[in-house]
Amino acid sequence: MYLHPRERRARHAEARPHSLASSPTRHPDVRAEAVEQGTMRAASSSRDGHATHAHAHPGRRRLRGAGRGCKLEVRNRITRRRFMYTLNPALVPSPSLTDPLPNPRRRPIRLGGVQRRFTTSGAVASPANADADTLPTAPNGQTLMLHNTMKRKKEPFVPRDAEQNKVSMYVCGVTVYDYSHIGHARVYVAFDVLYRQLTRMGYDVTYCRNFTDVDDKIIKRANENGEECDALVDRFIDAFHEDIDALGCVRPTMEPRATDHIGDITALCERLIEKGYAYSADGDVYFSVDALPEYGSLSGRKLEDNRAGERVAVDTRKKNPADFALWKAAKPGEPTWDSPWGAGRPGWHIECSAMIESILGKSIDIHGGGQDLVFPHHENELAQSTASCRCCTEGELGLGGGKTNEGPEEPFVRYWVHNGFVKVDSEKMSKSLGNFFTIREVTERYHPTALRWMLLGTHYRAPINYTQRALEEASDRLYYLYQTLVESKDALVDAQAKDAETAGETKTKPKPKPPTGIAAEGIDLAAETNAAVDSALADDLNTPLAIASLSAPLKTLNDLVSTKKGKKAVGRSVALRDLIAAVETTLESVGLPREGGEGLLEELRELTLRRAGLTRDDVDAAVAARAEARAAKDFAESDRIRDEFGAKGVALMDGGNQVWRPATVVDDK
């Protein structure tokens, strides 16, 4: 009997006993997607009694609840046989170990002749529903998994005041001496999403973001400009608010300035000196890193690295070259405040520790910032705050805390959260390289919402590559999204009017029936979209996956807009209504405008013309010239005009209601 080669390979695989756990290679048809550094074993046999087996390679993701009923179902589409595999609890790490960055392109797997999916008690595995009986949940019943830099892994989020559902979050703000750049945009968009997610999950969040308003850079810039430091600071704080507000970020609960907490800073310095963690020298106060053997636990750096580090300034007054300044003695031309050690000003690191303790308390739930702040800023903050609360040397730094004067042991910060770097055209952003961009420089050419969309398209912990092409694509995607919403809402009004007209023609009131056809499909897709977005954001703020979930409902909405007659139009209004609501809910959850409408589309068109160096009259003239060429059947001229404007980012349309729309510029810069 002749067998197709694929059939022979499938039968050969089924007849050959082989354990998943012992396979060193990756089979092209079967892949274990959920286990990192783990293995899998066969759990059942196929229907014809043959042993179930396949080659597998440890995947890049771990499935939560491993070893507790979590299974991998495999169906061979050629032989029609189903196999079931379970994770080996003895070989799989616990669910709390480090997960890699989420893959925004991960979709239901269909490779070769095999379709597979993970199931946990019949549900798709996700942080929101995996191990629901053991994982802590938020007020809305979900579990938020958050990557903790201190632990180097994702953990279920549990606030200190879980009973009252209160969360305290502190994010390091800007040093206000210049306009904010796209690196700042990355930080504050990321933590705006976290703030929104915590609020959506039902937590009462106190969000604090400071301003460093006394610093060497501020003093230098004020002297260069010939203005007072206070005037410079006020001007750039206003500019910061304008830029960040334009990106759609919610204002924090409070925004303290360092200079408003000088008394708290000097008190903290005194306490550290009394406890033996700091010392004064000629009007300066330094923190002694040798007093804390655990110093470096957050960044993973050792004291030996600091001593040998080339960036450590040599100062003979220091006990250790790595000791850092808590208080700086006064210098001519600098703002100063009185202190027990004479006139001076605070160091950078002590400011955040003092403000956190004064406003939020000795322990907080979340401390955030850019990855560049892990060392030295956050490492030094952790050392200062932990040491100030210790009444002895017991306890571990940041890992359960030391014993405090107020009772139970509690770490300074429960969850350290950091976002990844921003690169420009794959290079480090630097003024010397000429690739340094402020937020307002970018938003003069591109819509702020496009910049936010671009930032959301990369997971917050991953490095992001800023390119002009990425912004072009973000702008194009936004135009498609909001154009679809505008057309869908118009179609919804039309569909509801037709439903009302049909109902008026019916003499007897119809009995309520469950939704069927398009209505049922629309309701289901809307529910699936909402669930997918909730699951993505609960899994360490996976914004790429959340916004990717919009693709299916947007495509369906476009189909519904063009479906106006026949049986397919029955239930159209219900599907439109639910899908529009699902899209708008997703937009709101990641901080994008819920209702952009024609206003946002018009702004996108205006910015396109500005980038292209064109006016409305130029476009109208091109449209007219192209129409004449087409009427004369001069299609070569028509194509030339279209391509000329397309290269500038203006797509001339051949039909429909639109005459032209923004388009992605092909040239990648």
What are these regions (language model features)?
Residues 129-131, 428, 437-669:
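Structural preference for alpha-helix termini/caps and helix-kink/transition segments
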